[in-house]
Amino acid sequence: MVPRITKMEVFPVAGRDCMELNLSGAHAPYFTRNVVVLTDSSGLLGVGEVPGGEKITKALLDSIDLVAGTSVGEYKNTLVRVKEQLDRSVAEDVRGNQTFDQRTGVHVLTAIEAPLLDLLGKYLE
């Protein structure tokens, strides 16, 4: 039986940033990231991470109910449901001036897709 997602956790993290290694340039001496951890019904963990920020964190937290309980094998359907919710709730999701994409939706979908694919790969192995 294909595992189901039993839990989605979102961990905002911050740390010191080395400005010489930051592709986005010297904006601040720190970084923020959102780490998403999905647990499936087999007890396995899938992990993903994306840039931080309150909008991204809030959108991830708002997506928990759409992800929890879904089948790992139907990850594309899960992502479609999350995208539909984002399309309704995130106004003016525009690209920023920095060299990385600041659109909330792009990062939220990536933060969920990466651990789903992590779990799918473990299941198919």
Please give the residue ranges for each predicted region.
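Metal- or metallocofactor-binding catalytic centers and their adjacent structured scaffolds
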Residues: T39-L124
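Structured beta-strand/loop patches that form or line metal/cofactor-binding pockets in enzymes
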Residues: M1-V47, P51
